[in-house]
Structures are given as structure tokens and as C-alpha cells.
Amino acid sequence: MSKMSSLQGKMRQHTIIVMTLLFLFITGYLLTQLKVQFLSFFAGLSVSFLNLWTTYYLAKVVGKVADQKRKHSVLPFILAGFGYLIRIVLALSVVYWALINPDTLNVLLVIAGISLIYAIIMLDMLFQFMRKR
């Protein structure tokens, strides 16, 4: 299996997990009284997943450019740099939104939602390591 298809498989797996969690957060928001909590987790995880998808997409673009035998354009590498800036701005904007709207979003739970994608990735790596042993 090539590295790109492995990357695509991981992204597909993470997408399924995140979409399931987002569905649960929306369901919790609609069916319980914990609206601020579920909406905060939803906002944080949504932005975090968007950041992960941006990283995946730019890695794909840069990988395709690196595989080509001809002279490389600098544009994909510049876009990858801007991708980092975009990810930081997205995370800061959702935290800022939580700070200015404390009755709608809880800042700590938004940050926990942003961090949740990293927990998913670490657990996936742990399960993969345990399967190989």
C-alpha cells in the first residue's frame, strides 16, 4: 500500500469518526438542556477537523508536485505556508467568538473540542500500535 493511499485511508477513517461525533453533538444540542456545552464541542471539533482536512489537502498537493519530474513551482509551497496561517486564524477566531459570546459558547469547551481531534489521532495511533504487536 502506498503512502498516499494510507494517508487517504487514515483521512477517511478520521472523517467517519469526526462526523459521528459531530452528529452526536448536534443531537445533544437539539435534545438536551446542555445547549452551550454541545454547541461549544461542535464548534471546536468542526474547526479542528477543518484544520486537519486543510493539512491533508495541502500535503496531497505538495506530494503531487514533489512526485513530478519537471521543474517545481513554488506556488504549492507558498500555499502550504498560508495553510498554516489559515489554520491558526480559524482556531483563534472560534476561540474569540466564544470569548465575546459566553452565553452561546463556553471557551474551555471550545478549546476541548479543538483538542479532541488530537485525542482521536493519538488513540488511532495507539490502537494501530497495539494491533501490530
UniProtKB/Swiss-Prot annotation:
- Pfam families attached here? ATP-synt_I
Transmembrane spans: 16-36, 38-58, 74-94, 107-127
This protein's membrane topology, according to the annotation, is: Multi-pass membrane protein
BP GO terms, sorted: proton transmembrane transport
Q: Where in the cell is it found?
A: Cell membrane
- List the GO terms this entry assigns under cellular component, sorted alphabetically: plasma membrane; proton-transporting ATP synthase complex
**Keywords on this record?**
Cell membrane, CF(0), Hydrogen ion transport, Ion transport, Membrane, Transmembrane, Transmembrane helix, Transport
Question: Is Ubl conjugation tagged as a keyword?
Answer: no
**Free-text function comment from the UniProt entry:** A possible function for this protein is to guide the assembly of the membrane sector of the ATPase enzyme complex.
| Family listed | Belongs to the bacterial AtpI family.
What is the protein's given name? ATP synthase protein I
